[in-house]
């Protein structure tokens, strides 16, 4: 079934957006309160711009930019393959945004998924002798729930805060990510919270019944491009999952 956008889809997608962005901090971080800013690589360079603004405001002395290429930046679904790893593209954007010196950035160029963003960055900071007890993670706004769930599973000794660039569901789409693709991403990230927790790739997150119902209705409407294999029969449903 071809996915089409209408008022029902907008309402359902708005519910997913509100859920996924709920963990985002709305007040500016206190200068000097965090050890690092971890920017999760993706196709959205606004994340790198926001990380640069956080650094420029004194949120942390160091930015860790993490990412090789994901499905989108590797050329999936007809998109152009990025010539360089996401971390390198992010670094270029961060420099252009706030003039960040190379000494204030660490580039992690091997991660191909969110779990690896954290495990590889954790190893990289440790190799540089950097103790991380409080940290900011920034990513696409709708990755708030998944970013923190992954952080607590793979870098649990640090206390994490999620920050993202401003704007809501209707503000996020642009020429690079139209509304239809955003809805596919929202559906996929909702599924990942459930599936990845069962696979023990991330910590369990309580998904309210109305959020899960919105997800199911959007899947039925054809928004399935960002779904992953759901063969998790050998894994128990996480206790944090609210079953409809």
Give the residues covered by each predicted segment:
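A structural signal for short, hydrophobic/glycine-enriched beta-strand patches
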Residues: 1-186, 241-244
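A conserved mid-domain beta-alpha-beta active-site/ligand-binding segment of alpha/beta enzyme cores
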Residues: 175-232
């Amino acid at each position: 079934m071809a996915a089409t956008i209408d008022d029902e889809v907008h309402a359902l997608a708005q519910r997913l957006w509100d859920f996924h962005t709920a963990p985002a901090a709305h007040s500016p971080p206190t200068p000097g309160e965090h050890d690092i800013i971890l920017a999760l690589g993706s196709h959205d360079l606004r994340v790198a711009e926001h990380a640069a603004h956080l650094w420029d405001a004194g949120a942390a002395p160091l930015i860790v930019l993490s990412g090789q290429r994901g499905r989108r930046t590797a050329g999936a679904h007809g998109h152009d393959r990025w010539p360089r790893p996401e971390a390198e593209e992010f670094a270029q954007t961060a420099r252009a945004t706030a003039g960040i010196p190379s000494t204030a950035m660490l580039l992690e160029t091997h991660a191909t998924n969110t779990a690896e963003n954290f495990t590889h960055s954790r190893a990289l900071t440790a190799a540089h002798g950097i103790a991380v007890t409080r940290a900011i993670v920034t990513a696409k706004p709708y990755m708030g729930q998944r970013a923190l769930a992954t952080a607590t599973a793979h870098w649990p000794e640090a206390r994490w805060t999620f920050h993202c660039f401003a704007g809501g569901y209707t503000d996020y789409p642009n020429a690079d990510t139209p509304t239809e693709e955003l809805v596919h991403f929202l559906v996929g990230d909702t599924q990942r919270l459930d599936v990845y927790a069962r696979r023990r790739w991330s910590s369990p997150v309580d998904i309210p019944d109305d959020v899960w119902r919105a997800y199911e209705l959007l899947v039925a409407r054809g928004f399935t491009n960002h779904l992953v294999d759901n063969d998790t029969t050998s894994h128990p449903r996480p206790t944090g999952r609210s079953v409809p």
